[in-house]
Amino acid sequence: MEIAIILKIIICHWIGDGLLQTEQMATQKSKSTYWLSAHVGAYILPFIVVFYNILGWVLLMAILHWIQDWITSRINTQYLQVKNNTMFWNSIWTDQMIHYVILFTSITYFI
C-alpha cells in the first residue's frame, strides 16, 4: 500500500473522528442512535471528499464505524460512570486501533 494512501486515511480519520465530532455527538452517541448517526455522517465526510472514486469502500467504512462506535461508546460510558480513567483511556486507544485495522485492511480490497 502506498504511503500516500496511508496518510490520507490517517488524516481523514483524524478529521472525521476528532475534529468534526462535536461534544454532543461524543457524549450522546452511546445513548442515542440519532447522535451516533450524526457522528458517522460527519465522520465520513472527509472520506467522501478524498476517496470519491471508491464510494463502496466509504459506505462500508460508515457502516462498520457505526457498528463499532455503537459498541465501544457504551463500554466507554460505563468506564466513565465508575470513574475508571485507566480503563476508559485503554478503551479509547483500543477503539482507535480497531478503527485503523479495519480501515487499512479493508481498503486493500478496493484499490
Roles of regions detected by a PLM:
Residues 1-4, 49-58, 111:
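Transmembrane helix interruption/hinge and helix-loop junction motifs
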Residues 9-43, 66-108:
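Interhelical loop and helix-boundary elements at the membrane-water interface
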Residues 48, 52, 56-57, 70-74, ...:
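Amphipathic alpha-helical interaction segments
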Residues 58-67:
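Functional transmembrane alpha-helices
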